[in-house]
Amino acid sequence: MSGIPSEDTLLHNSGPSRRFCVAPMMDWTTSHYRYLARQLSRHTLLYTEMVTTGALIHGDTARFLRHDEAEYPLALQLGGSDAGELAHCARLAQQYGFDEVNLNVGCPSDRVQNNMIGACLMGHPDKVAEGVRAMIEATELPVTVKHRIGIDGRESWDDLCEFVEKVSEAGCRTFIVHARIAILEGLSPKENREVPPLKYDWVYRLKAKYPHLEIIINGGIKTFDECHEHLRHTDGVMLGREAYHNPWLLAGVDPEFFGEAAPVETRHQALRAMLPFIGSELERGVFLTHMSRHLLGLFHGQPGGRQFRRYISENAHKSGAGLEVIE
């Protein structure tokens, strides 16, 4: 199997720059966090939390897909395995203005496994290929896949290559690879981010073997020096928890990786830039704590940073708490 997409497919799957991305993270990469991230970097590609196809089709679609245009470029991550449902949701992604639609084939949670969502799908590459093909036919957006390097029982190099080849033959050009296997039984999602060893060299080998594919590396990346090393071997980097707990890191992305000045020069400037958005959300009935929790790491490692965290944590949840807590 060559796995070489046609020229039309390559064009179809280009989309936004993925040189530097922030990973989709449940409960963390909400619209409120993404708005903060965008005050710090104009070019970082942001991802939503995973949304299941069932939630989008049978739930409050508008609520799940709500975002601010200021968040662009923005990708929607879907969880699901039914080709028809994935196609329907890919159309919704385009309708709501997203820049990319991404399929989750990396989450190891028991809850999603039972619904054939996430990392368990690495054991069913034909099903993933079917879903990807349906999504590509349903939308003009680039369709990408985020996955592990394997799962227990299917963790060989040949297994990984079979997965990538089958999914690329379905038309997927971009693979975001978490450089660990997922152990589907016996480990929690948190343990699955820490216990299986990182094998960055496997991701490098994927890019070397399939140079026509766009390979983005993910897993345990924390510093710009590490990013530059990975970019010697891959097309892009994706950071997760480091970009959440230390969001000011993102203020260095545009000058470091895109040759442009950062949108803000100081943390205080970033905080002030958030105030109109927070105010409008408060008027919409959103509780302050739903937004302020994403600000807690903004002064990470700075003098007064702990006091800032403590003050926000102790006051944002109080009844009637408003902008005065942040200001």
Question: Model regions: which residues?
Answer:
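Conserved beta-strand positions in the central sheet of alpha/beta enzyme cores
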Residues: 21, 46-47, 75-77, 102-104, ...
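Active-site beta-loop-alpha junctions enriched in small/polar residues
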Residues: 25-27, 51-53, 79-81, 106-108, ...
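Glycine-rich, positively charged N-terminal anion/phosphate-binding segment
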Residues: 2-10, 14, 25-99
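Alpha/beta catalytic cores of nucleotide-metabolism and tRNA/nucleoside-modifying enzymes
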Residues: 1-16, 20-21, 26, 32, ...
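Short secondary-structure transition/capping segments
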Residues: 57-61, 113-116, 156-157, 187-190, ...
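Pocket-edge positions in alpha/beta enzyme catalytic cores
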Residues: 78, 119-120, 195, 262, ...
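Short, hinge-like loop/turn segments at secondary-structure boundaries
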Residues: 63-67, 119-121, 161-163, 192-195, ...
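Alpha/beta enzyme core
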Residues: 39, 87-117, 125-213
